[in-house]
């Protein structure tokens, strides 16, 4: 319902975010430092976010594909890296059970409806804390000043 209510009232689920300023401050952990996040609220100036960061036991920047999974039911939204494998790790969970339309801070008010999927590769701005294009380390001579994201496939399953 983005066209009808706008952001953040439409709700936003960031399944995987990497490149956070916190990861850059711990260079030996940067390749495994990530988070999921949910954003909601009635307006820009009353925007709420829950997106704790974590460090995985394995790197997602090892040149291999990784299975990133979201499970979303009536109670929780959960995000996993390497789902269904020996190295599976849950890195995000938010409780969306409660619904109370008299309280616009309640996350459950915004996550009980269909969503659409966007893939976004950002290399500067608020999240990494980089404002000067010359300081963006993701763009360099080694990669011909190009940032790339490779997605092998996307599957969506839904209960009837």
Enumerate the language-model features and the residues they cover:
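GH16 jelly-roll
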Residues: 1-160
């Amino acid at each position: 319902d983005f066209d009808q209510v706008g952001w953040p009232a439409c709700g936003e689920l960031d399944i995987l975010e990497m490149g956070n300023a916190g990861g850059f401050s711990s260079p030996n952990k940067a390749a495994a430092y990530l988070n999921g996040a949910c954003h909601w609220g009635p307006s820009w100036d009353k925007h709420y976010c829950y997106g704790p960061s974590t460090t995985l036991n394995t790197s997602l920047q090892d040149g291999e594909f990784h299975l990133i999974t979201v499970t979303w039911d009536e109670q929780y939204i959960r995000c996993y890296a390497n789902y269904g494998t020996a190295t599976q790790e849950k890195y995000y969970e938010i409780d969306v059970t409660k619904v109370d339309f008299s309280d616009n801070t309640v996350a459950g008010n915004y996550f009980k409806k269909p969503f659409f999927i966007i893939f976004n590769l950002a290399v500067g701005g608020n999240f990494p804390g980089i404002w000067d294009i010359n300081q963006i380390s993701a763009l360099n001579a080694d990669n011909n000043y190009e940032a790339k994201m490779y997605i092998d496939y996307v599957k969506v399953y839904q209960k009837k």
